Amino acid sequence: MNISTWSTLVTPESCHRLAASGHSLLIVLHYNHSGRLASRGGSEDGGGLGMLRGPSVAAGCLVVLENAMVLAAIAIYMRSRRWVYYCLLNITLSDLLTGLAYVVNVLLSGTRTFQLSPVHWFLREGLLFMALAASTFSLLFTAGERFATMVRVAESGATKTSRVYGCIGLCWLLAAILGLLPLLGWNCVCAFPRCSSLLPLYSKGYVLFCVVVFALILVAILSLYGAIFRVVRANGQKSPRPPARRKSRRLLNTVLMILVAFVVCWGPLFGLLLADIFGSNVWAQEYLRGMDWILALAVFNSAINPLIYSFRSREVQRAVLAFLCCGCLWLGLRGPGDCLTRITEAHSGASTTDSSLRPRDSFRTSRSLSFRMREPLSSISSVRST
């Protein structure tokens, strides 16, 4: 008896028994009902991934390595403990976990999907949802703190630090709740009419809820940066000095980069999920062929975030260069003078004494490289935070 014939003979009572026992046949049943099983084209194709499995894992590993490098560089070589420092660490950590969750999701996809218990399936998908949510919540928190820094009166460092810690903890708590909601009961197990075609055990109501949450986050981020830009532009018009106008242009470029990155990376995924929610199963199956690319594009946003939020800061650039320099020294790939000279030359335009690295003769002593706090950590913040 094939899967299609067997699934038609399954009664609601037997389906609930499969769910209670945590049997993997429940996943097969849901995939067959959604049409995902018929569209996989056999088990030898890797469950729709096929030749994309290798590049997908490689892309996820690159996201992990990129964010791990930035995370280590900021944590080791930057002495600043202002609020932006914690925001950058939070964004980088969430993007690193997004890359890890994506790699785990790809490795457990394909034929391995039907070897998972329902709980493991919910954890596989929920971990990726949680990581993506943490990344977007972190971007929203950073935008909110930038705006609050500009409009609030000066406050004590202890008060600001406590609020930053609390908001970071809230970001991760909300992300964990959002990712675990299906495991906690918001799912469509044995309720096939309410099931998503793209994520066969997820309720369409939950998918719609996630789309609305992510869309509201995007609108809030763009609104906050738009307000920040208006404040900076107004200050620049009051001040005829060229640095103020350059700061306004730099902020505008950053806001445009954030907008383009969000629309390009998240727009296709939003469209796919909306088609799944409001379209028919046949319509959803037509878009299903591009699901792997669309999900990879959303994860790619975690590779772009360091370029927007971290590498645009000269202080972070110096930290990353110092981290790479010490790695070269440890591997013996180039002499300390050559390595450190390149870093010094990269920032020699600021000041002859602005070099934040001191040449050392060994890898051990190179770890004590120090940075001068000559400029704000964030290139798009108009005032120093206390």
From Swiss-Prot:
Residue intervals annotated with topology Cytoplasmic: 78-87, 142-163, 230-254, 312-386
Residues carrying sugar: N2, N32
One Pfam assignment: 7tm_1
Ranges in the topological domain labelled Extracellular: 1-56, 109-120, 185-208, 276-290
GO biological process: adenylate cyclase-activating G protein-coupled receptor signaling pathway
GO cellular component, one term: plasma membrane
Tissue and organ distribution: Specifically expressed in fetal and adult lymphoid and hematopoietic tissue. Expressed in lung, spleen, thymus and lymph node but absent in other non-lymphatic tissue. Coexpressed with GNA15 at the same relative levels in all tissues examined, with the highest levels in adult spleen and lung.
Molecular function, one GO term: sphingosine-1-phosphate receptor activity
Topology with respect to the bilayer: Multi-pass membrane protein
Membrane-traversing stretches: 57-77, 88-108, 121-141, 164-184, 209-229, 255-275, 291-311
Entries under InterPro entries matching the protein: EDG6_rcpt, GPCR_Rhodpsn, GPCR_Rhodpsn_7TM, S1P_rcpt
Residues lipid-modified (S-palmitoyl cysteine): C325
Keywords assigned: Cell membrane, G-protein coupled receptor, Glycoprotein, Lipoprotein, Membrane, Palmitate, Receptor, Transducer, Transmembrane, Transmembrane helix
Location of this chain's protein in the cell: Cell membrane
Family: Belongs to the G-protein coupled receptor 1 family.
Function: Receptor for the lysosphingolipid sphingosine 1-phosphate (S1P). S1P is a bioactive lysophospholipid that elicits diverse physiological effect on most types of cells and tissues. May be involved in cell migration processes that are specific for lymphocytes.
PANTHER family the record matches: G-PROTEIN COUPLED RECEPTOR (PTHR22750)
Protein name from the UniProt record: Sphingosine 1-phosphate receptor 4
Organism: Mus musculus
